[in-house]
């Protein structure tokens, strides 16, 4: 939430936060695909819409979605999608520790991985935050973001050698690549 706590979200009449929120959202997403009960299936589909667009969605993380405005409105101020406060707090190692603890994780080899968050390398922003506890793995795969980020994205690779963060430069053409 805006004060550094876990936001409380009402899911069908009951408040959830932290890991419990992610658990209940996952349960409903599975119901959207697998439930034989039409009402439970519909609730699951509604939850999928919620996690795609809602301000306190752990997957979306912005105050509003402005897709309509980007296509149909000229006023640039209406197109802004402000990140929720998580993205400021997560820069602090003590907050990253709080999130990790909520999931029963601790130690020097645990990480929070966030995706689909443009990293503005041109402005000096790093995809690694909170002394290495947080890693942002998307820096601009989408061509539309590249002029703002200065990069074509990051990929986190995990193999027998460990974790590797790879930066991708924009692909210009087959001729320049060869």
Name what the model sees in each region:
Residues 1-178:
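Feature recognizes metal-dependent phosphohydrolase scaffolds
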């Amino acid at each position: 939430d805006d004060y550094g706590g876990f936001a409380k979200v009402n899911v069908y009449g009951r408040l959830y936060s932290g890991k419990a929120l992610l658990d209940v959202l996952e349960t409903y997403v599975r119901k959207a695909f697998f439930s034989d009960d039409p009402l439970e299936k519909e609730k699951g589909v509604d939850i999928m819409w919620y996690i795609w667009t809602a301000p306190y969605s752990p997957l979306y993380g912005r105050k509003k979605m402005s897709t309509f405005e980007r296509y149909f409105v000229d006023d640039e101020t209406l197109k802004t999608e402000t990140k929720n406060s998580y993205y400021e707090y997560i820069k602090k190692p003590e907050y990253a520790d709080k999130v990790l603890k909520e999931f029963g994780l601790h130690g020097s080899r645990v990480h929070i991985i966030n995706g689909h968050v443009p990293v503005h390398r041109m402005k000096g922003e790093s995809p690694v935050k909170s002394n290495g506890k947080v890693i942002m793995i998307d820096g601009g795969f989408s061509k539309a973001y590249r002029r703002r980020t200065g990069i074509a994205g990051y990929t986190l690779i995990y193999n027998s050698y460990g974790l590797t963060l790879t930066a991708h430069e924009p692909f210009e053409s087959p001729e320049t690549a060869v």
